[in-house]
Amino acid sequence: VVGSDSGTDDSLVDAQPGNAAGARRTLVERLQADGVLTDPRLREALSRLDRGVLLPRAYVRRSEPGTDPVVWELLDGTHPNDRAEWQELVYSGESVLVQRDGEPPESQVRGAVSGGRMTAMSTFIPYTVEVLQRMRIAAGHGYLDLGTGPGVSLALAAALTGPRRAVGVERDEHMAAFAQNNLERLGAGATMVAGDALDGHAPRAPYDRIHSGIGVPCLPSAWMDQLAPGGRLLTTLTTRTPSWPGRCLVTRTATGRIEAVLEGGPRGHRPLYGYTWLTAQHHLHRIADRPGRPRTTTFTPPADEAYGFWLSAAYLVPGVFRHFQADTLAVVAPEDDSWAVAGPGDGTVHVHGPRDVWAELENIHNLWTRAGSPDRFYVDIPADGGQQHVTSGTGPDALQWVLPPLAAMPGQPA
């Protein structure tokens, strides 16, 4: 997992039986071919990281979508009947589910279980690679990883910083201890602590690089306080919709000034513990059966890749969820029992409910266009911990909004 200068015992690189080295090679080659992996140091770290040590067991869903309760199966990478499927999953690059209902990982029993929710997982590896490359981690940097989970991202970061420079904070004490033990088996030179990610980790501050593996509604003041001059912080800014995440890059200049840029993107981290996303699960069958009243429309929503528009919609058309599995664009305001479903390119839209979410999207599109179709926004972070304002610029047509405070969100128990 780490370079030769970190003291890694090469005998640990393939701690699990089977062709893990070949699976790692295939994953790295695919990431390179897709243009995701460009940093040679990170390529070396990925080539050496035995994910099987950090993800020795994994849950897979066995029931059909919509089934309640969900049926899961826990795969054990050391069991001959599970080995092939487990290894394919662990090295697929997909997110790997590793904990159900906060269970101690050491108590997990291979086999089928029913119900419950997943409380820890690894991150989609292309996104992990994208984040780590954007962080520009150098040897010797002090690195803080927040919401670390099983420790995959932390292990890769530690390979870039060198030993004893990377620390992770995980709220679940069972997962923190489990990850620390596995990191030690790898000789990763990283430290895990149990605690509230919103508090950062003051004992090792300041940090040259801070990465948050949880989405937050605004930027916690503790994170700002623990960012060193010249430092970079990367986090997901989350709203109540999972459909359009924001990615915020915070830098502290050499003179100590904080600057923050917010952009939309195709994916982000899940929100902090206790934060509830909107869901349209109970509306989907109704939308399919009775899409609503038809009417003509001249509004053609921009492409999915117009991340600036969709990020603006997440804040300025609040409480709306996109149904990505629909054949055409469908947006739902579940708490208002309202939705809009675009026609199949025929200039029509079907609307339902007291809230005209289609008209709201059209209005925001007009404002976004008038503002210059911005794809990035600027976050003002007052030193006194006051409201954090977002703007697309300084002109009279600039889009702007205020980030919701952390105080309005459920806390994270340590």
For every predicted segment, state its role.
Residues A303-Q325, A333-P334, D346-E362, N366:
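Basic, glycine-rich polyanion-binding accessory segments appended to enzymes
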Residues D336-A414:
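C-terminal target-recognition/interaction regions appended to catalytic cores
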